Amino acid sequence: MIIPLIKGLSLTLKRFLNPWTCETEAYPEKKPHLAQRFRGLPELQIEEDGKEKCVACGLCAKACPSNCITVEGAEDEETNRRYPEVYELNAFRCIFCGFCEEACPVSAVILKDTFELSTYKETGIFDKEKLLDLTRKRKGLKGPS
């Protein structure tokens, strides 16, 4: 009974006396290092010409186990290309599993490193423009083209 107590105290003293073994990070001032496989908020990707990659097939919504994605497609009459007229992501319901990313045939949905999602209820539902703005901001692009 006394030996585990001594082991615990020795570990505590060793950590206390050696300043190089500090595990605490100054989070708000210094962003944490995220693993390469980290899954954060899904973002809609943009093609080189500035148009969205999504073809509104709805596979991401079907693959989502938490039903947090809503897609309604429409067709562009000039190019005969489908696009999402409505694309909504409910960040409160999302479990960041990555199934939407795996299901997308054109790689339009990618889980990025956005993890600071504390927000009010009104702003937790991301529509198409909010998701595209996240990608534009990351790539340094201006508003819609």
Name each model feature, range by range.
Residues 1-82, 88, 92-93, 102, ...:
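Non-ligating segments of multi-cofactor redox enzymes
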Residues 97:
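Basic, alpha-helical nucleic-acid-binding regions used in initiation and control of genome expression
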